[in-house]
Amino acid sequence: MKNVVALILAGGQGTRLGVLTEKIAKPAVQFGGKYRLIDFTMSNCVNSGIYKIGVLTQYKPHLLNRHIGIGKPWDLDRKDGGVTILQPYSTEKVGVWYKGTADAVYSNIEFVDSYSPDYVVILSGDHIYSMDYNELVDYHVAKSALGTVACMEVPLSEANRFGIMVTDLENRIIEFQEKPKFPKSTLASLGIYVFQWNFIREVLMEDAKDENSTHDFGKDIIPKIINTKRVYAFPFEGYWKDVGTIYSYWESNLELTRPIPPFNIHDENWKIYTHSEEMPPAYISDDARVKNSLISEGCEIYGEVYNSVLAQGVEVGEGVIIKNSVVMSRVRIGNNCFIENAIIAENVVIGNEVKIGVGEFVENKLNSRVYNSEISVIGMDSVIEDKVKIGKNCVVGIDKIVSKSLTSGEYI
């Protein structure tokens, strides 16, 4: 790999994930049974031979910091390079929060300078995909580009959620719209950039002085630098998913249970590394039934699990039926429960004879923009007491004790 430093933007709150990110940053949310979202970007880096990595954290970083540690699971505990957690710090002139994605990189110029790189790759820490960044950098070099933006085609109905590009026949970006109401194309930025470091360094320093800038790559930096006529789009044709909503998070997890999933977490040639607890193998009893599901280490299954993803250390009692659900680590489920179309966050305790996901769909009373499907969400460290019924599209916040039933659309 050429002399490259990677910066992973991992400070996002992920407000559209609701209670799932009340205690932790979005990149720290569990995914696929044993992983956290940031694992996919971190693994892409080391699989691409990039071992000089800065992780820029901000919102509730403690679990994320502990998860990454010194980077040992990714072979990043090394003298030359490795991974460095870069949190906002206060000086006499600068506040303690990054003002935007560009300001986050600007605030860590000294870190990048310490490696004297030719190129910097800037990545998001909360997307699901596999990409060889060598191909991205090689494309960038071949084009003699100052900047390159990875992109893919998206449905027109979703284009207003992305930065949208218009390109010429050589893939040169000639226009960039950030989340436009009326998109001029369906070519969307994936939030994956490579820049010549000396070039983007100067751009960021100029942007920092601009009082009218929001200091954001999509809103300010990319639209500004396309005037150089040396900023290109890199077409990406693999699987890429922004699991930024409750539904997309649930759907992307359950896609992994298909016989041939659209995203392969079992690829021996492109492994996904993570920091995980040492747990014994999963135990599935004689009376249990498991079909089309991912069952992680340390699980004990005495009931029935269908089309679901269970993270490490989940206990499923006798007479339990779980369907189309995502259950995060160390959840304990009592006996004779029914759970369907649910996301249950870490360390939740569910009593006996509990039902979750029953009844008819009703619009959510807490936030119908965030919670807008039949999926019910149970926040971290909550307790659902015996015989409680929870309807569809319900929300239980973090650290709650639920002793009374909730009809569809209700919250606590």
Swiss-Prot record:
Task: List GO BP terms, alphabetically.
Answer: glycogen biosynthetic process
- Reaction catalyzed: alpha-D-glucose 1-phosphate + ATP + H(+) = ADP-alpha-D-glucose + diphosphate
Keyword flag Transferase:
yes
Keywords, A to Z, come to: ATP-binding, Carbohydrate metabolism, Glycogen biosynthesis, Glycogen metabolism, Nucleotide-binding, Nucleotidyltransferase, Transferase
**Where on this chain does alpha-D-glucose 1-phosphate bind?**
98, 163, 178-179, 189
**Pathway(s):** Glycan biosynthesis; glycogen biosynthesis
Record keyword Nucleotidyltransferase present:
yes
**Entries under InterPro entries matching the protein:** ADP-Glc_PPase (IPR011831), ADP_Glu_pyroP_CS (IPR005836), GlgC_bac (IPR023049), GlmU/GlgC-like_hexapep (IPR056818), NTP_transferase_dom (IPR005835), Nucleotide-diphossugar_trans (IPR029044), Trimer_LpxA-like_sf (IPR011004)
Which EC number applies?
2.7.7.27
Q: Name one GO molecular function term.
A: glucose-1-phosphate adenylyltransferase activity
Oligomer status and interactors = Homotetramer.
Give the similarity note: Belongs to the bacterial/plant glucose-1-phosphate adenylyltransferase family.
Question: What is the purpose of this protein?
Answer: Involved in the biosynthesis of ADP-glucose, a building block required for the elongation reactions to produce glycogen. Catalyzes the reaction between ATP and alpha-D-glucose 1-phosphate (G1P) to produce pyrophosphate and ADP-Glc.
Q: What is this protein called?
A: Glucose-1-phosphate adenylyltransferase
Write the gene name.
glgC
